[in-house]
C-alpha cells in the first residue's frame, strides 16, 4: 500500500527563554541547518507495490509532474551510522543542498519480461539425458504391445547411426563399444557373446528334472524311515520266498485264554467252576466225579438235549456265562447186565433240564427205568406218567416188547 506524505506543522512556540535554550543545545550537538526553501514544485510520486523475481530494486516511478505544495521540512540532524540503505542514500548529497525524500519501491514487471531462472543446477541438468524429439527415433519405437515386450526383452539400445550427432545416447553407445573392444583385446579366447535366452522347451525340461529329483529324495526318505522303524526285520530268504498272501480262516488262539465261570447243575445243586475257554470238558467230568464220589464213567454232561463230548471245549461249543450244563449220574449196573446188549434210553421231563440218560437191559421191565429216574431227579412220591410215541407206559413192558433201541426218548409228565 502507498504511504501518504506526512506534513509537519509549526512547532508550538514556548517562552523566549526556553526557545533560546533549545537553540543552544541544538547548536552544540547538531550541524547547522539548511536554509528553508520556499514552496517548490515536486513531481507527484505514484506509490506502487512491485513484484519481481530478481533482486534489483528501483527507487521510484515518476508520473506526470504536478505542482504540489510541500510544507517546510526541518533540517535533519547529523547522519547516524545506520545499516539501512535508505539512510545511506539520503546522506550522499552535499550538506548545503536540500534533501529529497526518496522511497524505494519494487518494479511491476510484465509476465513476458520476467527473467528465466533454471530450476536444476548444471550438474543435475547434465545427468538428465533425455531422448530428443526426433522422427528417426520415433520410427524405431514399436506400436504394438507384443513388439514392446520383445524390445524390452532384448534390452538393446538403438543403433549409433540412427541417433542424431548431439545425442547423449550416441556417446554412451560409443563408450560401450570401446569397452567391449578392450575386453576382446584383454581376453581374446573368452567368449563374451550374450547367452541365448532359455526357450519354453528348456524350461519344461528343467521342470521335469526338478520333479524327478524330488521323487528320488522322497523315496530315499521313505527307505530311511523304514530302516529306522522299530519293527523286527525278517530275513531276506523269508521275504523273497513268495509274493502271494495266504489268508488262513479261523480264529487265532490268544496266548493267555481268559477264564470264565461255568455253571453245572446236578440234581438240586448248582456248581460254579472256573474254566478256560480252551480247556476240554474232561476236566469238568473229573471234577464232578470227585465232587459226587462216583466213577468218571458214570458222569454225563448235557447242554439242553445234546450230550456233550468230553473232548469238546467251551470255545467250540460257544458257551457263555449265562449258560448252564446239566450233569447226570448214571446208575451202577450188575455184572450180567454189563453186556453189549444194554440199551441207553433218554428220559426227558417236563422241564428242559429234567433229562436223564439211563442204561437198561432188554430183558428188564421199564419199571426199573421209572424208579431210577424218580430217584435221580428227586421226584420220589410224585405221580409221574411216562410216554413212548404217545403211548402211556405202565412199567410192566419190556424194551423188546416196544421195540426200543439205544437213543430212544421217553417223555415224563407229572
Curated annotation (Swiss-Prot):
InterPro entries assigned to the protein according to its UniProt record, in alphabetical order: NFATC2-Int_DNA_Repair (IPR052324), Rad60/SUMO-like_dom (IPR022617), Ubiquitin-like_dom (IPR000626), Ubiquitin-like_domsf (IPR029071)
Location in or out of the cell: Nucleus; Cytoplasm
SMART domains, per database record: UBQ
GO biological process: positive regulation of transcription by RNA polymerase II
SUPFAM superfamilies recorded: Ubiquitin-like
Domain Ubiquitin-like: 343-414
Region (Disordered): 1-42, 63-118, 139-208
Regions of compositional bias (Low complexity) in chain numbering: 68-79, 90-100
Superkingdom of this protein's organism: Eukaryota
GO cellular component annotations of the record: cytoplasm; nucleus
Any Pfam family matching the protein: Rad60-SLD
Post-translational modification: Methylation at the N-terminus by PRMT1 modulates interaction with the NFAT complex and results in augmented cytokine production.
Residues modified to Phosphoserine: 52, 54, 83, 85, 87, 121, 193, 199, 309, 364, 385
Transmembrane segments: none
Location of Phosphothreonine modifications: 311, 313
Keywords carried by this UniProt record: Coiled coil, Cytoplasm, Isopeptide bond, Methylation, Nucleus, Phosphoprotein, Ubl conjugation
Chain segments annotated as coiled-coil in the UniProt record: 170-229
Covalent cross-link Glycyl lysine isopeptide (Lys-Gly) (interchain with G-Cter in SUMO2), where: 123
Compositional bias of kind Basic residues: 7-33
Biological function: In T-helper 2 (Th2) cells, regulates the magnitude of NFAT-driven transcription of a specific subset of cytokine genes, including IL3, IL4, IL5 and IL13, but not IL2. Recruits PRMT1 to the IL4 promoter; this leads to enhancement of histone H4 'Arg-3'-methylation and facilitates subsequent histone acetylation at the IL4 locus, thus promotes robust cytokine expression. Down-regulates formation of poly-SUMO chains by UBE2I/UBC9.
Subunit structure and binding partners: Interacts with NFATC2, TRAF1, TRAF2 and PRMT1. Interacts with UBE2I/UBC9.
UniProt name for this protein: NFATC2-interacting protein
Species of origin: Rattus norvegicus
Gene: Nfatc2ip
Amino acid at each position: 500500500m502507498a504511504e501518504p506524505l506526512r506534513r509537519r506543522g509549526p512547532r508550538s512556540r514556548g517562552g523566549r527563554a526556553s526557545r533560546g535554550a533549545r537553540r543552544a543545545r541544538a547548536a552544540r550537538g547538531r550541524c547547522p541547518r539548511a536554509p528553508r526553501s520556499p514552496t517548490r514544485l515536486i513531481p507527484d510520486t505514484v506509490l506502487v507495490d512491485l513484484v519481481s523475481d530478481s533482486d534489483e530494486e528501483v527507487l521510484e516511478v515518476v508520473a506526470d509532474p504536478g505542482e504540489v505544495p510541500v510544507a517546510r521540512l526541518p533540517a535533519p540532524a547529523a547522519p547516524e551510522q545506520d545499516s539501512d540503505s535508505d539512510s545511506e542514500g539520503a546522506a550522499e548529497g552535499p550538506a548545503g543542498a536540500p534533501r529529497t525524500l526518496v522511497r524505494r519501491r519494487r518494479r511491476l514487471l510484465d509476465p513476458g519480461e520476467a527473467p528465466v531462472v533454471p530450476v536444476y543446477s548444471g550438474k543435475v541438468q547434465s545427468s538428465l539425458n533425455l531422448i530428443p524429439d526426433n522422427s528417426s527415433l520415433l520410427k524405431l519405437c514399436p506400436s504394438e504391445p507384443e513388439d514392446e515386450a520383445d524390445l524390452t526383452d532384448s534390452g538393446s539400445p538403438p543403433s549409433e547411426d540412427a541417433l542424431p550427432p548431439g545425442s547423449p545416447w550416441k556417446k554412451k553407445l560409443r563408450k560401450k563399444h570401446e569397452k567391449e573392444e578392450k575386453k576382446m583385446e584383454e581376453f581374446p579366447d573368452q567368449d563374451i557373446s550374450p547367452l541365448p535366452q532359455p526357450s519354453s522347451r528348456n524350461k519344461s525340461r528343467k521342470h521335469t528334472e526338478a520333479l524327478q529329483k524330488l521323487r528320488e529324495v522322497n523315496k530315499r526318505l521313505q527307505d530311511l524311515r523304514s530302516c529306522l522303524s522299530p519293527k523286527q526285520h525278517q530275513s531276506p530268504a523269508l521275504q523273497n520266498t513268495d509274493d502271494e498272501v495266504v489268508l488262513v480262516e479261523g480264529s487265532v488262539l490268544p496266548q493267555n485264554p481268559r477264564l470264565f465261570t461255568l455253571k453245572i447243575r446236578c440234581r438240586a445243586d448248582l456248581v460254579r467252576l472256573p474254566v478256560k475257554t480252551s480247556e476240554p470238558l474232561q476236566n469238568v467230568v473229573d471234577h464232578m466225579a470227585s465232587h459226587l464220589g462216583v466213577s468218571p464213567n458214570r458222569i454225563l454232561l448235557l447242554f439242553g438235549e445234546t450230550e456233550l463230548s468230553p473232548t469238546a471245549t467251551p470255545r467250540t461249543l460257544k458257551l457263555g456265562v449265562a449258560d448252564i450244563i446239566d450233569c447226570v449220574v448214571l446208575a451202577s449196573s450188575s455184572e450180567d447186565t454189563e453186556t453189549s446188549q444194554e440199551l441207553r434210553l433218554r428220559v426227558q421231563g417236563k422241564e428242559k433240564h429234567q433229562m436223564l440218560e439211563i442204561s437198561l437191559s432188554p430183558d428188564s421191565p421199564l419199571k426199573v427205568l421209572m424208579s431210577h429216574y424218580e430217584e435221580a431227579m428227586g421226584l420220589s412220591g410224585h405221580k409221574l406218567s411216562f410216554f413212548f410215541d404217545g403211548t402211556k407206559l405202565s412199567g410192566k413192558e419190556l424194551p423188546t416188547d416196544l421195540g426200543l433201541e439205544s437213543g430212544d426218548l421217553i417223555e415224563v409228565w407229572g
